Amino acid sequence: MAQETFNATGKRKESVARVRIVPGSGKVTINQKPMDVYFGRPVLRMVVNQPFSVTEMENKFDVLVNVHGGGVSGQAGAIKHGISKALVDYDEALRPALKKAGFLTRDARTVERKKYGRHKARKSTQFSKR
């Protein structure tokens, strides 16, 4: 643990988050805005803080995030993934708890592509028997 900052990249759907954690007071800044301003919904703030609550590291790190792409839910998931990877970079002993919670696994689910001859990915035109 020679370095003071720990960097990681998190991904979810179309969102990519570059996360830097620094030992501090627990302040989270996302795209130069406080987390309360960037994420209005409390559920999204809870998702971002999940890695800290699982590892019992609340209010021990300041988090600086650059995130782009996707919507707010995908961005929150990308930040969670990035924070989890940065915490493992900080202390390898945290890996089993984060792995058990599933925070280190990249969620590979993405939007299914639209097919031609259909309205959406799976929605088809109405079937007429006669």
From Swiss-Prot:
<keyword id="KW-0689">Ribosomal protein</keyword>
<dbReference type="GO" id="GO:0003735">
    <property type="term" value="F:structural constituent of ribosome"/>
</dbReference>
<dbReference type="InterPro" id="IPR000754">
    <property type="entry name" value="Ribosomal_uS9"/>
</dbReference>
<protein>
    <recommendedName>
        <fullName>Small ribosomal subunit protein uS9</fullName>
    </recommendedName>
</protein>
<dbReference type="Pfam" id="PF00380">
    <property type="entry name" value="Ribosomal_S9"/>
</dbReference>
<keyword id="KW-0687">Ribonucleoprotein</keyword>
<dbReference type="InterPro" id="IPR020574">
    <property type="entry name" value="Ribosomal_uS9_CS"/>
</dbReference>
<dbReference type="GO" id="GO:0003723">
    <property type="term" value="F:RNA binding"/>
</dbReference>
<comment type="similarity">
    <text>Belongs to the universal ribosomal protein uS9 family.</text>
</comment>
<dbReference type="InterPro" id="IPR014721">
    <property type="entry name" value="Ribsml_uS5_D2-typ_fold_subgr"/>
</dbReference>
<dbReference type="InterPro" id="IPR020568">
    <property type="entry name" value="Ribosomal_Su5_D2-typ_SF"/>
</dbReference>
<dbReference type="GO" id="GO:0006412">
    <property type="term" value="P:translation"/>
</dbReference>
<dbReference type="InterPro" id="IPR023035">
    <property type="entry name" value="Ribosomal_uS9_bac/plastid"/>
</dbReference>
<dbReference type="GO" id="GO:0022627">
    <property type="term" value="C:cytosolic small ribosomal subunit"/>
</dbReference>
